[in-house]
Design a protein with these regions (language model features):
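Well-ordered secondary-structure scaffolds
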Residues: 1-215
Length: 215
């Protein structure tokens, strides 16, 4: 966590450290976020649903009995066994679809296609080390331009376009770590500040799953 609070599309999320702080934040119709890597708070708060949105492509320990409604995003979960519902995260016809038996589509490792560009859009760290950014999100970059350094090793733009994603400056990355992505749609500057079509679709699927579970 790098910020104490952040706002996306008029919805503010606030970092909290206690249940009391979380309740106070939610009373203001804001989102409370708590750092809890071991999930210790799950058994300490009253909740109707648990959503595993880690997107690790595998189940890191979520079980179906953790909440009245348990939801897993993407591959790694078996609906009806690990969780009650799986939400499809693969771009395409089934994105956001609810799965009540079985699994989501397996991870292909291939980024979604935008204007004919797929693998070229994503930049991975050429080595392990500390990231030192030269460019920032929203910058227009040209193919071959240096966007960052890993220690002293330069990282080059894989294509020309809008720098839509970039790992935090000072982050310690491993070799091959996904650290940036470029959008060929240079005129869609606002995409850097708004919820993506994919995230909105998956979020809608989560909401549908919760409402269906409560009905």
């Amino acid at each position: 966590m790098y910020e104490g609070k952040f706002t996306v599309e008029d919805m503010m999320c606030v970092l909290v450290s206690t249940i009391e702080e979380a309740k106070a934040v939610m009373a203001k119709n804001q989102v409370a976020m708590m750092v809890d890597p071991n999930g210790e708070m799950i058994s300490k708060i009253e909740h109707i649903a648990l959503v595993d949105a880690i997107l690790a492509k595998k189940n890191l320990g979520t079980t179906i009995d953790m909440a009245p409604i348990t939801i897993g995003l993407g591959p790694g979960f078996c609906a009806g066994k690990d969780v009650h519902v799986v939400v499809e995260t693969m771009r395409g016809h089934n994105l956001g679809r609810l799965i009540y038996q079985g699994h989501a589509l397996p991870n292909t490792g291939v980024p979604g296609n935008i204007k004919g560009y797929s693998k070229e859009r994503v930049i991975h760290s050429p080595c392990a080390g500390v990231c030192h950014n030269v460019k920032k999100i929203t910058d227009i970059v040209e193919k071959g331009e240096i966007i960052a350094y890993i220690d002293k090793t330069p990282v080059y733009a894989s294509m020309s376009g809008l720098l839509r994603g970039l790992i935090q400056d000072g982050y310690n990355v491993t070799s091959g770590f996904k650290m940036a992505d470029i959008d060929p749609r240079v005129d869609e500057y606002q995409n850097c500040f708004t919820i993506s079509d994919k995230a909105r679709c998956i979020g809608g699927g989560v909401l549908e799953a919760i409402l269906h579970g409560l009905s």
